[in-house]
Amino acid sequence: MRKSLLALSLLAATSAPVLAADYSDGDIHKNDYKWMQFNLMGAFDELPGESSHDYLEMEFGGRSGIFDLYGYVDVFNLASDKGSDKVGDPKIFMKFAPRMSIDGLTGKDLSFGPVQELYVATLFEWDGTDYKTNPFSVNNQKVGIGSDVMVPWFGKVGVNLYGTYQGNQKDWNGFQISTNWFKPFYFFENGSFISYQGYIDYQFGMKEKYSSASNGGAMFNGIYWHSDRFAVGYGLKGYKDVYGIKDSDALKSTGFGHYVAVTYKF
């Protein structure tokens, strides 16, 4: 049976008590689901560099057996506007974040306290350009430990800690902690709802030879209206020395950016 992100989010928001993952019965596919959506995005004062532009995002995720997946593909400057801040920049950016359930792999319930499930977590980031022709090419692989944690009011929050391997430099460069959440908090009679959704990506322990700041990150705070097929939202994103770039007059990397989105769900 097809389960949408909407259904899972509502379940997470309304179920009491919330049970830990239990695969001791051998049925690793009982929690399977999948979802996909397209987001037409507008970004304003995005950091670093205070860029304003449009882009189309294909966003997807799901669960199949012991594997959990989230990812997206962004395509920038859809109309190829010569006045866009993205002119001359890579056209595409991709992020894939597969996780493998340790609970599902071992068939054991490894939950403790608010931690519901443990994962081997990975994250891959690419912009599709060649490092030989673009010194700022993105080619990062990250691996570490992941978890689903029950947090008061928020419900289930994904928490992952990675070590960062920079593929272009062929070297490890610090760590990243990432969290994400989706919390419906106001419901309408027609079944639509308003959610608070977002994430934190914070990098630390970065090497001086690759970064002008040893730590930095970003936090996205989105307020979205959702129906079964559509969503409309606004996001405020806060930055602090993002990507390890020290904030300066020459390149602003600390501050706030704004995002608007219109979504169609498949």
From Swiss-Prot:
Residues 1-20 form the signal peptide. GO terms for molecular function: nucleoside transmembrane transporter activity. Its main location: membrane. Keywords: Cell outer membrane, Membrane, Signal. Serves as receptor for a broad-host-range vibriophage, KVP40. Belongs to the nucleoside-specific channel-forming outer membrane porin (Tsx) (TC 1.B.10) family. This is Outer membrane protein OmpK. It comes from Vibrio parahaemolyticus serotype O3:K6 (strain RIMD 2210633). The gene is ompK.
